Amino acid sequence: MDATQLTELMGSHDFMQLQHQLHHNNNNYNTDGHNGLSSESAEGSSRPVRRATRRTSQLSNNTYDLEMTDSSSQSDDTSGGGGSSNGGGSTTNTGHPSGCSLGGQGPSGRGRVQQASSGACPSTIAPNSTSSNSSNANGNASRRRKGALNAKERNMRRLESNERERMRMHSLNDAFQSLREVIPHVEMERRLSKIETLTLAKNYIINLTHIILSKRNEEAAALELNSGAVGGVLLSNLSSESGGPVASGIPANSNAATICFEDTLASGGAFDCAILAATDGSLLNAATVTTSPAMQSIQSQAIHLQTPMEQQQQQASHLPHHQQAMHGHGHLGASIQSQQQPSLVLNGTTSVGLGIGIGVGVGVGVGVCNNAPSFADINDNFDEPFREFL
């Protein structure tokens, strides 16, 4: 560039216009039709003063070419491309985003446009990079917040689990204390431990189970042996013993046998077994009944229970001596009728007649006879368990 071209440049209308903009900061300047400035260049003139000052320092440099000193080069960094008043060069839009333009075809023009583009395009691309960075930062922050929430949630869950464990241990200790109070044990200075309480409870359960099973076995064996008893009630230990009492001077038999009553009488009347049980729940232990060898040839004898009215009607004709004995024990009597009495078998071969008279809450009298004679001595032995009620 020679001095002539530089002089023309400094004296041009465009240069004067730029100086005027720098001094007055006119943002609304509109050029005339002959100055060759477009509306886009006018918009570009509204840039801050600092950028304009930098542009002025660039224009004052002697390294610029005359062809690239048109007004379009002043606003190529912000405009989409403007026409040249001198017609020397034209700026073309290269399709860059955010309106970056490249002007001129000369080497200096390319360098200048590249410099301008480097100053303008990063400002337009920066929002995209900023948005991506902000999204990454938000993602990291959200991950950090999520981790913090998880830690808080884990802490709450740990506290809840500890509370449940404490409640479970309290309930377990209360249950063991209740078990200690129920189980009998020797008092000690310290209370039983949990393992001692469980061991003691196990031993009690085992022993009680053995006792219950033994009782059940005994009851089952008794039912099997006494399956013919009336209503499940039998007269036990009603047997003859060696060396027992003598009936009317007849020696006693050494053989013994257990007897039980039939379900029904020969006359068809039902037998009330409740009167055979004592008040304490035990079965009636009858006195021993003895027989002599002379009585072994006697056939089946019957046992008959009568109401008190029937016994009073038949006392005079059947058992006068036994009647006197029964009057001494509550004016009760019993008679024997061999025609309608069920048999009472002793030792499988011997049978005797047995009469029983029962008073309501007064006393019991028993007489044994061989169709005619009575054995008054047996009465005193048979009612022995009931003497406390007389």
Swiss-Prot record:
<dbReference type="GO" id="GO:0000981">
    <property type="term" value="F:DNA-binding transcription factor activity, RNA polymerase II-specific"/>
</dbReference>
<dbReference type="GO" id="GO:0007423">
    <property type="term" value="P:sensory organ development"/>
</dbReference>
<dbReference type="GO" id="GO:0061101">
    <property type="term" value="P:neuroendocrine cell differentiation"/>
</dbReference>
<keyword id="KW-0805">Transcription regulation</keyword>
<dbReference type="GO" id="GO:0007419">
    <property type="term" value="P:ventral cord development"/>
</dbReference>
<feature type="domain" description="bHLH">
    <location>
        <begin position="156"/>
        <end position="208"/>
    </location>
</feature>
<feature type="compositionally biased region" description="Low complexity">
    <location>
        <begin position="122"/>
        <end position="141"/>
    </location>
</feature>
<keyword id="KW-0221">Differentiation</keyword>
<feature type="compositionally biased region" description="Low complexity">
    <location>
        <begin position="69"/>
        <end position="78"/>
    </location>
</feature>
<keyword id="KW-0963">Cytoplasm</keyword>
<keyword id="KW-0217">Developmental protein</keyword>
<dbReference type="GO" id="GO:0070888">
    <property type="term" value="F:E-box binding"/>
</dbReference>
<feature type="glycosylation site" description="N-linked (GlcNAc...) asparagine">
    <location>
        <position position="140"/>
    </location>
</feature>
<comment type="function">
    <text>Transcription factor that regulates neurosecretory (NS) cell function and neuroendocrine cell fate. Acts as a master regulator of common NS functions such as Phm expression and neuropeptide production. Plays a role as a regulator of peptide-containing large dense-core vesicle (LDCV) production and peptidergic cell differentiation. Controls transcription of FMRFamide in Tv neuronal cells and Fur1 in Ap-let cells (Tvb and dorsal apterous cells). Also required for up-regulation of Phm in Tv and Ap-let cells, and expression of three neuropeptide genes, Ms, FMRFamide and Lk.</text>
</comment>
<dbReference type="GO" id="GO:0006355">
    <property type="term" value="P:regulation of DNA-templated transcription"/>
</dbReference>
<dbReference type="GO" id="GO:0061564">
    <property type="term" value="P:axon development"/>
</dbReference>
<keyword id="KW-0238">DNA-binding</keyword>
<feature type="compositionally biased region" description="Polar residues">
    <location>
        <begin position="55"/>
        <end position="64"/>
    </location>
</feature>
<feature type="compositionally biased region" description="Gly residues">
    <location>
        <begin position="79"/>
        <end position="90"/>
    </location>
</feature>
<keyword id="KW-0325">Glycoprotein</keyword>
<feature type="glycosylation site" description="N-linked (GlcNAc...) asparagine">
    <location>
        <position position="128"/>
    </location>
</feature>
<feature type="glycosylation site" description="N-linked (GlcNAc...) asparagine">
    <location>
        <position position="347"/>
    </location>
</feature>
<keyword id="KW-0804">Transcription</keyword>
<dbReference type="GO" id="GO:0046983">
    <property type="term" value="F:protein dimerization activity"/>
</dbReference>
<dbReference type="InterPro" id="IPR011598">
    <property type="entry name" value="bHLH_dom"/>
</dbReference>
<dbReference type="GO" id="GO:0045944">
    <property type="term" value="P:positive regulation of transcription by RNA polymerase II"/>
</dbReference>
<dbReference type="GO" id="GO:0002793">
    <property type="term" value="P:positive regulation of peptide secretion"/>
</dbReference>
<dbReference type="GO" id="GO:0046887">
    <property type="term" value="P:positive regulation of hormone secretion"/>
</dbReference>
<feature type="glycosylation site" description="N-linked (GlcNAc...) asparagine">
    <location>
        <position position="61"/>
    </location>
</feature>
<protein>
    <recommendedName>
        <fullName>Protein dimmed</fullName>
    </recommendedName>
</protein>
<comment type="subunit">
    <text>Forms homodimers via the bHLH domain. These dimers bind the core E-box sequence.</text>
</comment>
<feature type="glycosylation site" description="N-linked (GlcNAc...) asparagine">
    <location>
        <position position="133"/>
    </location>
</feature>
<feature type="region of interest" description="Disordered">
    <location>
        <begin position="24"/>
        <end position="163"/>
    </location>
</feature>
<feature type="glycosylation site" description="N-linked (GlcNAc...) asparagine">
    <location>
        <position position="237"/>
    </location>
</feature>
<feature type="region of interest" description="Disordered">
    <location>
        <begin position="312"/>
        <end position="339"/>
    </location>
</feature>
<dbReference type="GO" id="GO:0005737">
    <property type="term" value="C:cytoplasm"/>
</dbReference>
<feature type="glycosylation site" description="N-linked (GlcNAc...) asparagine">
    <location>
        <position position="207"/>
    </location>
</feature>
<dbReference type="InterPro" id="IPR036638">
    <property type="entry name" value="HLH_DNA-bd_sf"/>
</dbReference>
<feature type="compositionally biased region" description="Polar residues">
    <location>
        <begin position="29"/>
        <end position="44"/>
    </location>
</feature>
<dbReference type="Pfam" id="PF00010">
    <property type="entry name" value="HLH"/>
</dbReference>
<feature type="compositionally biased region" description="Basic and acidic residues">
    <location>
        <begin position="151"/>
        <end position="163"/>
    </location>
</feature>
<dbReference type="GO" id="GO:0005634">
    <property type="term" value="C:nucleus"/>
</dbReference>
